Swiss-Prot record, chain A:
Gene3D superfamilies: 3.40.1360.10, Winged helix-like DNA-binding domain superfamily/Winged helix DNA-binding domain. Component of a topoisomerase 6 complex specifically required for meiotic recombination. Together with MTOPVIB, mediates DNA cleavage that forms the double-strand breaks (DSB) that initiate meiotic recombination. The complex promotes relaxation of negative and positive supercoiled DNA and DNA decatenation through cleavage and ligation cycles. This is Meiotic recombination protein SPO11-2. Mg(2+) binds at E217, D270. InterPro entries: Spo11/TopoVI_A (IPR002815), Spo11/TopoVI_A_N (IPR013049), Spo11/TopoVI_A_sf (IPR036078), TOPRIM_Topo6A/Spo11 (IPR034136), WH-like_DNA-bd_sf (IPR036388). Coiled coil: none annotated. PROSITE patterns: TOPO_IIB (PS52041).
UniProtKB/Swiss-Prot annotation, chain B:
Belongs to the TOP6B-like family. The lineage of its organism: Eukaryota, Viridiplantae, Streptophyta, Embryophyta, Tracheophyta. One of its GO terms (cellular component) is cytoplasm. One of its GO terms (biological process) is reciprocal meiotic recombination. Despite a weak sequence similarity, retains most of the structural features of the ancestral archaeal Top6B subunit (AC O05207), including the transducer domain that interacts with the SPO11 subunit and the ATP-binding fold, also named GHKL fold. Expressed ubiquitously in different tissues, including roots, stems, leaves, seedlings, inflorescences, siliques and pollen grains, specially as a higher level in inflorescence. It is found in: Chromosome; Nucleus; Cytoplasm. This is Type 2 DNA topoisomerase 6 subunit B-like. The gene is MTOPVIB. Disruption phenotype: Defective in meiosis. Sterility due to male and female gamete developmental defects leading to disturbed embryo sac development and abnormal pollen formation. Strong reduction in bivalent formation at metaphase I caused by defects in meiotic double-strand breaks (DSB) formation. Impaired homologous chromosome synapsis and recombination. GO terms for molecular function: DNA topoisomerase type II (double strand cut, ATP-hydrolyzing) activity; protein-macromolecule adaptor activity. Keywords: Chromosome, Cytoplasm, Meiosis, Nucleus. InterPro entries: MTOPVIB_plant (IPR034566). Heterotetramer of 2 SPO11 (SPO11-1 and/or SPO11-2) and 2 MTOPVIB chains. Interacts with SPO11-1 and SPO11-2. Binds to PRD1.
């Protein structure tokens, strides 16, 4: 089935059907929950009683659209206005329906106390209260996203924090309100942890003399680059999300990109479809959290690894693509969001059936990584 | 014993006729059966008398009666019925001998001298006969028949059975079958009302084996859930129309039931009445019972046990403390009629279905399909969360709005009350949705938006590898 791609000639208006989650204050979020309770009760106790269905913004690929920026260089994925229906009387959705109300109940209490909890904490709370409904973190996360899609307010607005995995290091000073500034070049090789508190991130003052922001897929590579203080040679800030980026790390990067709009953001990932998918999550946002992720899309550039780096890598370091890789590749190719040269790279991966990890560059010595990045920057080889 | 089998059948036919004569009389009537076994003879002879004070008989009813003199090589009776009958307007009591063994019509009936009534005004009939053998095999079928007849609660007829063995008064037993006095519908109640009340009694009194309600099983009638359905068939092309009435009683027995001698094993007895008389369940009714979509009512029919029209339904996964009792009654709109057409299968099915739906409508959350029962199992948790949302709020306006929407007056109402109310309400809606025909099931309103956008079904499983997944940390 042909997906609606949003690639119409009316590009200015391509996002007019954008659905989004508002960022709300606790009392505003509470008010939305209260309205949903009242609506439910009203319909339940009306002369023609019914159990209201939950209309959730569809978080499927079929409801995703792409906004290709014309006036800006940022493109992003957003969710359009199709809904899914979660109904108590449908066997398929009955449990999910109850889960939504359970999550709303807990969020309501959190909001009343003006506290914030992580999804992990939420999971344990729900596991204790309602073990019949929540058996895994995934179920909790999905229900949280259902509540986001129902109330159309961001997860953070519900009092739920993204427990961030993000780290930052290099030529950046961060000053949280009422605290002393932190020098991210002096935090050791483990870097400075990005908080999951989006509000705090929003109020943090940032200063830098860096010329580049470099995102590294893997924690080990981040660690190597920071330990070698590569940011002394290349004036830059390193960020890693240790894999697929959480919302807080994306939020942080987006904040940096708007604070320092002239700094190019370069991404160093493995040469495999998953690496490209991670890059794309920074670049375009994601469908799963599509109601809020689109806000944090940044125009990142792909610095490596890429097909023309393969000559730097010994043949034996190339390993065959896994079935999961092929799946991701297929999904990416059909997404219609990739620019031409990304498609070429992806096709090359599929064609050769091989993948390569950044660590393969260590065959030239541990300090080669810094030189590799420097060379790429000097030659302007990022796409 | 077996060689006497035609006799009980003949007796029940005679009793049935007598009962109909009583039923059609407008007055209070009595139907007495006497079994008198002489102890001096070997083999014993039992004299039988069936006497009623109903309208007089018209002899036609004996036309088709048959009963062989011998059965399995043994002589069972002399083939002779003696009948005395008189109508209210008659001046005398007519007396006949009817030889059931005679197939030539005019030799069959022999009129005997009549007796003058001397101006007395009464009506009635007495049929007597003598059979060889002990009366033991006759008592049980007659009692069983009477126990069923009184389910119909035909109030103007009293039934009794006298069993005599020899002349000594110590060897006499009298059984009286009367309608239970504690909740008797009035004379003008409809047939259906009486059948309902009668079937309730039948259950409470253990198939009418007891004189009063079984205290072990029931503390009161509230343990019974009753549903009824009626379907009428119009008169058509000289065919006399009829009415199909179905009553279903479900009893939630008490835990103490296990102390009770009668155990139902969760089986369902089906009583069938044909024109006000207990009758074996006909094949069409059996097929109808098999064709009912029981799953719609959360029941799984495991087996239909048919022993010569005595039918039990057996269920799968059925709680043993719940008992279902079904009574079907088919009668012609005109009576008496020579026609003997029974109800069609669709009429039977419709009647049973109506009764089930009626029961379901009257008792919230009862007889729900397994699907709805599963959904209902989530409702307490859902209600708890919603009540939690209302009562954890610090916003008194919001709380007040919620309570007033639910129809509670004061702010002082307890959380449990509200929670229970919400729970009951949701279960009611689930039950209502189930009763609506599929095509009438409109989509439930959305919580926020009026669903004008394209909607699709919620898929619970995220598609693996679809695009790149978002981090759900």
């Amino acid at each position: 089935m042909e997906e609606s791609s949003g690639l119409s000639s009316m590009k200015f208006f391509s996002d007019q059907h954008l659905s989004y989650a508002d960022i709300l204050l606790p009392h505003e979020a509470r008010a939305r929950i209260e309205v949903s309770v009242l609506n439910l009760l009203r319909i339940l106790n009306s002369p023609d009683p019914a159990i209201s269905d939950l209309s959730l913004i569809n978080r499927k690929r079929s409801n995703s659209c792409i906004n290709k920026g014309i006036l800006t260089d940022v493109s992003y994925i957003f969710l359009s206005t199709s809904f899914t229906k979660s109904s108590l009387t449908n066997a398929k959705t009955a449990k999910a329906f109850v889960r939504v109300w359970k999550v709303m109940e807990i969020c309501f209490q959190i909001l009343l106390q003006e506290k914030r909890v992580t999804q992990r904490e939420l999971f344990y709370k729900l596991l204790c209260d309602s073990p019949d409904y929540f058996s895994s973190q995934i179920e909790v996360n999905r229900s949280v996203q259902d509540v986001v899609a129902l109330l159309r307010c961001s997860r953070y607005s519900l009092g739920i924090m993204a427990s961030s995995r993000g780290l930052v290091a290099g030529r950046l000073f961060l000053q949280e309100p009422g605290k002393e500034a932190v020098d991210c070049s002096a935090c050791g090789s483990s870097g400075f942890a990005i908080t999951g508190d989006l509000n705090l991130l929003d109020n943090t003052i940032m200063r830098t003399d860096a010329r580049y922001i470099i995102i590294v897929e893997k924690h080990a590579i981040f660690h190597r680059l920071v330990e070698d203080r590569v940011f002394n040679h290349i004036p830059c800030v390193f960020i890693t999300a240790k894999g697929y980026p959480d919302i807080a790390t994306r939020f942080f990067l987006h904040r940096m990109s708007t604070t320092f709009p002239d700094l190019p953001i370069l991404v160093l990932v493995d040469w495999n479809p998953a690496g490209l998918a991670i890059l794309c999550t920074f670049k375009f946002g994601s469908i799963g959290m599509g109601l809020e992720a689109y806000r944090y899309a940044c125009n990142v550039k792909w610095i490596g690894l890429r097909g023309d780096d393969l000559n730097l890598i010994p043949e034996e370091s190339l390993v065959p693509l896994k079935p999961k890789d092929s799946q991701i590749a297929k999904s990416l190719l059909s997404s219609k969001i990739l620019q031409e040269n990304y498609i070429e790279e992806l096709s090359l991966m599929v064609q050769t059936g091989k993948r390569a990890e950044i660590e393969a560059l260590y065959c030239h010595g541990y300090n080669y990584l810094g030189k590799y990045i420097a060379t790429k920057i000097v030659q302007g080889k990022y796409i | 014993m077996e060689n006497n089998a035609p006799v009980p059948k003949l007796l029940l036919q005679l009793i049935s006729s007598a009962f109909q004569r009583c039923r059609l009389a407008e007055d209070l009537c009595r139907l007495s059966v006497l079994l008198d076994q002489s102890t001096e003879r070997d083999p014993p002879i039992t004299c039988i008398s069936i006497a009623d004070t109903g309208i007089g008989c018209n002899l036609e009813e004996f036309q088709n009666l048959r009963c062989p003199r011998e059965f399995n090589g043994a002589k069972i009776w002399d083939g002779l019925l003696s009948v005395k009958t008189t109508c209210f307007t008659d001046d005398e009591v007519y007396y006949y001998h009817i030889n059931l063994d005679e197939y030539i019509a005019n030799k069959r009936l022999k009129r005997q001298p009549s007796q003058a009534k001397n101006g007395a005004k009464f009506s009635g009939t007495e049929v007597s006969l003598s059979v060889f053998g002990s009366m033991d095999v006759l008592v049980a079928p007659i009692i069983g028949f009477f126990q069923k007849i009184i389910v119909l609660q035909i109030l103007n007829v009293t039934l009794d059975l006298m069993v005599k063995q020899g002349t000594s008064p110590g060897n006499q037993t009298q059984y009286v079958f009367a309608v239970n006095a504690d909740k008797t519908p009035c004379f003008t109640a409809s047939n259906l009302e009486r059948l309902k009340s009668g079937l309730e009694d039948y259950v409470l009194r253990h198939a009418n084996c007891l004189d009063t309600m079984c205290d072990y099983c029931f503390s009161d009638r509230e343990h019974l859930k009753v549903g009824s359905g009626t379907v009428c068939q119009e008169d058509k092309h000289k065919r006399v129309g009829g009415t199909m009435e179905v009553v279903i009683v479900i009893s939630d027995l008490l835990e103490s039931t296990q102390h009770c001698s009668r155990s139902c094993n969760g089986k369902t007895e089906v009583l069938y009445f044909d024109n006000f008389l207990p009758s074996p369940v006909p094949h069409l009714a059996l097929s109808a019972l098999k064709k009912i979509d029981w799953k719609k009512y959360g029941l799984i029919l495991a087996n239909v046990n048919d022993q010569d029209g005595h039918v039990f339904l057996e269920w799968d996964n059925f709680p043993s403390y719940v008992q279902i009792q079904i009574a079907l009654h088919w009668y012609h709109n005109q009576y008496p009629t020579r026609q003997k057409n029974g109800p069609g299968i669709s009429l039977l099915k419709k009647g049973i279905k109506n009764a089930l739906d009626n029961l379901k409508a009257k008792h919230e959350g009862f007889l729900l399909s397994s699907h709805s029962r599963k959904i209902c199992s989530y409702v307490p948790d859902l209600a708890r969360s919603i009540a939690g949302l209302i009562f954890s709020s610090t916003d008194l306006d919001f709380q007040g709005d919620c309570l007033s929407v639910l129809g509670f007056q004061t702010q002082e109402v307890e959380r449990d009350t509200v929670e229970n109310y919400i729970q009951r309400k949701i279960v009611t809606v689930i039950g209502m949705n189930e009763r609506k025909p599929q095509k009438d099931q409109e989509a439930a309103p959305f919580l926020f938006f009026d669903g004008e956008s394209e909607t699709s079904f919620f898929e619970d499983e995220e598609v693996e590898g679809e695009y790149y997944s978002s981090s759900l940390e």
